[in-house]
Amino acid sequence: MVKKIHFIMERHASIVAFLLAVLALTESQAFTSVKLPRDEHWPYNYVSIGPAGVWAVNRQNKLFYRTGTYGDNANMGSGWQFKQDGVGQVDVGKDKVGYINLSGGSLFRIDGISQGNPVGGSPKSWEWWTKYIGMSLREDTRFSSRIENQNKVLTFTFRTCFWASRITNWCFADSSYTETVTAGGSGTWITKSQLKYKSGTFGNPDTEGGDWITVDSGSFQHVSSGSGVVLAVRSNGELVKRTGITCSLPQGSGWTSMLNGMSRVDTYGTVAWAVDTYGDLYFINL
């Protein structure tokens, strides 16, 4: 009888272990991706998704809005509407889009985006000497972040700071070499070859937070913070998803590999968009 009980317990334990392994494997592979057909605007350099829809920049530095994606992040859209020439990088916020002017390194903002006018009004000059913009997903753009031309992270806050011999609301958040910055539901993250998370920003990225925590000392080229998810692109082009992210461990504990040959990624809600090294676009259901 004792042997029989032990056998049953061992059998149940092995079944449970098997089911847990299957569940873990399923979770690690629980995404689907669609590679968009090449169109007349191909190849692309950047893509961004947010409340104001999907926007992309091609290698001719033209900025486009993806038709049918405003307020509907799960929609892949059906075509592109041209918006602006001479654009280097774009990031989507809430009814606003920020982009970098390629020639002058100046930051511009497109306001007035709505369901009835998804491409918004005329671009407005916002700031000088900018190489990267991370827009706030709130209506208030003062919670956005940017990287200036000396590779330093600045956050747009309510405080007034003295910077570059003039008064501004852009305040230093990190003083060393930075490549990309992102702010979303999983907090504020940056790539500095290494990957770093700003403590105290999980669930509320619109705060200045605390110290920077090195999450991975490996080499990364891009990162995107979403709601409970962080996606990143390693320098070798591998798109990875951060695992183990919780309120008590916001920097997570590991990685799951997703796709190879990528250069950029952006996530919002339950989906993500990515660009590969050939300039092809990918729509990803997470």
From Swiss-Prot:
Keywords on this record?
Disulfide bond, Enterotoxin, Glycoprotein, Hemagglutinin, Lectin, Lipoprotein, Membrane, Neurotoxin, Secreted, Signal, Storage protein, Target cell membrane, Target membrane, Toxin
Q: Does the keyword Mitochondrion apply?
A: no
Which is a Pfam family this sequence falls into?
Answer: Tectonin
Is this entry keyworded Signal?
yes
Known glycosylation sites: 101
Location of the protein in the cell:
Secreted; Target cell membrane
Query: Where exactly are the transmembrane stretches of this chain?
Result: none
Please provide, in alphabetical order, the Gene Ontology terms of the cellular component aspect for this entry: extracellular region; membrane; other organism cell membrane
| Organism superkingdom | Eukaryota
Expression (tissue specificity): Produced by albumen secretory cells. Found in developing eggs.
Q: Where is the signal peptide?
A: 1-30
Q: Which InterPro entries match?
A: Beta-propeller_rpt_TECPR, Tectonin_beta-propeller
Write out the PTM section of this UniProt entry: Glycosylated. PV2 contains four O-linked and one N-linked oligosaccharide bonds. The protein contains 2.5% of carbohydrates (high levels of mannose, galactose, and NAcGlucosamine, and small amounts of NacGalactosamine). PV2 is a very high density lipoprotein (VHDL). It contains 3.75% of lipids. The major lipid classes are free sterols and phospholipids and also have significant quantities of energy-providing triacylglycerides and free fatty acids.
What's a single GO MF annotation on this record?
toxin activity
Function noted in UniProt: The egg defensive protein perivitellin-2 is a pore-forming two-subunit glycoprotein that affects both the nervous and digestive systems of mammals. In addition, it is a source of both structural and energetic molecules during embryonic development. The tachylectin subunit (31 kDa) binds target membranes while the MACPF subunit (67 kDa) disrupts lipid bilayers forming large pores altering the plasma membrance conductance. Both in vivo and in vitro, the protein shows wide pH range stability and is resistant to enzymatic proteolysis from gastrointestinal environments.
Q: How does it assemble?
A: Perivitellin-2 is a heterooctamer of 4 identical 98 kDa heterodimers, each composed of one 31 kDa and one 67 kDa subunits. The 98 kDa heterodimer subunits are held together by disulfide bridges while the heterodimers are assembled into the native perivitellin-2 octamer by non-covalent forces.
- Please report the name of this protein according to its UniProt entry: Perivitellin-2 31 kDa subunit
